[in-house]
């Protein structure tokens, strides 16, 4: 029997004919072998309390929370697009499709005659074999090994307050197409207490733009600026251009040069090594279905 059993109601330890300690109340389904729960048309697991005459798939609380998440996704997606950042439309559409799939209707029919209309009417159902988990007080997943989440389409994380991610070692993300981060109100920070911070655009441009001041500081050492073809510094029509081994200093107004000494000697140069970049492509056999 693999020590299998279903314990219902007022749970008491039962060893042979002896009644033992109180274990709790409700139900306890367990086995020392394997277990499976299957529902071919959909499954709802919840801790939302209901009356005994409520419909099994009365998912109003969980469904309303999904609808609220839809609204937040849609609002933030719209603001992000207004600022030329990425859109959340694909995730919003997937979430809406799932929420809609939890609302359908099936009609009951009584066999062998109807007694005072018993067995008739309509009840909520799912449009497809989806799984929905809902709780008014929190959901946790815990394991001493690894947790895996895989989806052929989209993964949505939506929180009404904050989303926190903490890693005891490394946080590593690899993205095939695009990474977009957008903040509406309170700014963005990227700090490293130790080690370098490296930002590379290995096959295109790198653009840094600010509405107001932009500062580049080195607290202890130096700032290096190097380019293979040209460096151009310009403001209000005046500019300094460094290109082809030449330096141009032009201005529509005054050029003021001051120093205790001025040295104008013959030509000199300082070669500066520039990095090279690799090219790669994701093999087709590792792509999820599109």
Language-model features: locations:
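Long terminal segments
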Residues: 69, 203, 212, 220-224, ...
């Amino acid at each position: 029997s693999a020590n299998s059993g279903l314990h219902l109601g007022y749970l008491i330890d039962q060893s042979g004919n002896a009644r033992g300690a109180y274990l709790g109340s409700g139900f306890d389904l367990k086995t020392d072998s394997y277990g499976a729960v299957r529902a071919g048309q959909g499954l709802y697991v919840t801790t939302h309390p209901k009356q005994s005459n409520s419909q099994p798939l009365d998912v109003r609380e969980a469904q309303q929370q999904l609808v609220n998440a839809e609204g937040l996704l849609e609002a933030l997606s719209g603001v992000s697009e207004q600022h030329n950042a990425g859109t959340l439309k694909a995730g919003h559409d997937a979430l809406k499709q799932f929420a809609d799939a939890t609302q359908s209707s099936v009609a009951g029919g009584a066999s062998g005659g109807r007694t005072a209309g018993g067995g008739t009417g309509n009840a909520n159902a799912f449009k497809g074999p989806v799984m929905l988990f809902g709780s008014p007080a929190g959901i946790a997943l815990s394991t001493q090994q690894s947790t895996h989440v895989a989806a052929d389409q989209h993964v949505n994380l939506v929180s009404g307050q904050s989303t926190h991610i903490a890693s005891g070692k490394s946080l590593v993300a690899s993205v095939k197409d695009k990474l977009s981060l957008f903040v509406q109100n309170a700014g963005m920070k990227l700090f490293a207490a130790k080690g370098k911070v490296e930002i590379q655009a290995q096959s295109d441009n790198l653009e840094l733009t600010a509405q107001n001041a932009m500062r580049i500081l080195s607290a202890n050492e130096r700032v290096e600026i190097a380019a293979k073809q040209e460096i151009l510094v310009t403001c209000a029509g005046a500019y300094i251009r460094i290109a082809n081994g030449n330096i141009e200093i032009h201005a529509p107004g005054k050029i003021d040069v001051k120093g205790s000494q001025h040295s104008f000697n013959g030509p000199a140069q300082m070669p500066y090594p520039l990095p090279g970049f690799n090219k790669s492509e994701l093999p087709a056999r590792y792509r999820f279905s599109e």
